């Protein structure tokens, strides 16, 4: 495929990924609860919503893989080794995303036990559900870390190659580095609460304009490939 085609694919993937993510947040709000027993009860009441969320998670995983390939194709002429590393990070993000539906399905099976089996509010079920919730959180943060590493690499290559406006590229680098620093701290339990929400705002301020730019303007040839 041509650079123009890959740029449009990447632009669409950025915006589609964000749109699906927002939809998941809206759907997830109805089944969110701090207590495990309450969470299982909500999942039982809104099982169809949980199933839709599972499908959307699979969609985001495929979108992440599509975005990884498109960004690699755009940036490989600037530095193939770094572009390959960025590709691996984003592919890893997508593959970890496939694990999330399995965890959700495990919780859903506990929330909606078959007739004749133990109820979801038994001590054993609650312990298992609590572990699955923690595992899901760890998996999400780990996938986000791979996303941040890959985003840092691709943003740097876009900046170095002058393929997009420098100001936008710098926002991408800064937003990505911020996540690279804070996400491991969140995984270790050293950062929590409002900070874990605010730290994503700079990334949104980068990816939404970038998606639109790639769709409308595309990317310039790498700086090293431009005539002097």
Where are these regions (language model features)?
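Hydrophobic, aromatic-enriched alpha-helical segments typical of multi-pass transmembrane helices
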Residues: 1-228
């Amino acid at each position: 495929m041509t650079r123009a085609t890959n740029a449009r694919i990447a632009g669409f993937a950025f915006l589609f990924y964000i749109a699906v993510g927002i939809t998941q947040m809206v759907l997830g709000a109805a089944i969110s609860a701090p207590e495990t027993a309450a969470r299982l009860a909500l999942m039982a009441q809104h099982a169809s919503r949980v199933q839709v969320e599972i499908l959307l998670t699979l969609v985001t995983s495929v979108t992440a893989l599509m975005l990884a390939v498109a960004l690699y194709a755009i940036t490989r002429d600037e530095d193939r080794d770094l572009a390959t590393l960025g590709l691996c990070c984003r592919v890893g993000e997508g593959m970890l995303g496939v694990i999330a539906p399995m965890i959700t399905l495990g919780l859903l099976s506990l929330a909606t036990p078959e007739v004749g089996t133990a109820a979801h509010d038994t001590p054993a079920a609650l312990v298992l559900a609590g572990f699955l919730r923690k595992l899901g959180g760890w998996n999400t943060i780990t996938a986000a870390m791979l996303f941040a590493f890959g985003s840092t690499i691709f943003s740097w290559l876009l900046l170095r190659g002058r393929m997009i406006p420098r100001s936008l590229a710098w926002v991408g680098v800064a937003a990505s580095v911020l996540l690279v620093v804070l996400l491991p701290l969140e995984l270790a339990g050293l950062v929590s609460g409002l900070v874990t929400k605010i730290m994503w705002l700079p990334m949104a301020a980068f990816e939404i304009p970038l998606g639109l730019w790639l769709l409308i303007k595309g990317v310039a040839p790498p700086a090293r490939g431009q005539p002097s």
